[in-house]
Amino acid sequence: MKRYQNLKVGEAFSKNRIYPFACNELSSILNLAYSLSPKNVKALIFQDTLSAFRLLPDINTSAAVSAANLLLKSVEAVLPKQKKNLAIVEFKQAKVALKRRSKNREEEDIDIPSLPQDILIHIFSFLEISSLVSSAQVSRSWNQATHENSLWQSQFDLHFNHKVLIRMQSDIDWREAFKKAYIAANSSEALRSGRGYCSYCDSIVWHENLRCLNKQCRLKSGNKPLDLITTHQVVNYLLGIESSDDESESDDEAFPGRLWKLSYVPDYL
């Protein structure tokens, strides 16, 4: 039970950016670990599943809806009849709430004040990537501001400069460079999990821009990127299973031996 609580899956459903990652992880836990888990852990998994559906209307992004639909499929395939029916009811209520809120937004006439482009660009320079992308959909002037090359150069430096060497030129389209690097990086299963190992927390954590959410950890580490781990490794940690021989060396390095040893503590609580 302690290992599942350490993962803090349920806490992620209230966070817009992390919600899809948490749904995908919970779906994998249902598929791979639910039947092997003790009753108290099953109860926590079920409660987190209900929370995921209940909080969906508050997130209301296409990525969140897609992830919630994936979670629903796992619910239908894994949970016993009574729990499955309760979860399905919660999901249907969430969908109704989503439609109601979308309709209300369409009926509202929102007058977005027009700000000078230089002020918008300055504001957008403080946004993380998902918020920057979302801002482009608000209005034409906001969309124009989000195309500012310097914004994407900063995002590129933050996410990829430690991994990708790029020949410096004055005419680089940083938005396009970021897009290509992002697509290439997302081929990594570890990056798609939203998880990393923080040596300062000594635990598996959700990451923000590849950094621990804990401000103190970021300060102690000099804001260095976390060691990323895959959803499969998260499930293995939950079950107390060591990495298989066929996993890549990078996966093993990203999941330190000390944490593997912790996973073998008897889970009687």
From Swiss-Prot:
Signal peptide residues on this chain, from the entry's feature table: none
Query: Looking at the UniProt record for this protein, which Gene Ontology cellular component terms does it annotate, in alphabetical order?
Result: cytoplasm
The protein's matches in InterPro entries, at most eight in alphabetical order, are given as: At5g52880_ARM, F-box-like_dom_sf, F-box_dom
- Where does the F-box domain lie? 109-155
Q: Name one Pfam family in it.
A: At5g52880_ARM
Q: Which Gene3D superfamilies match?
A: 1.20.1280.50
Return the protein name.
Answer: F-box protein At5g52880
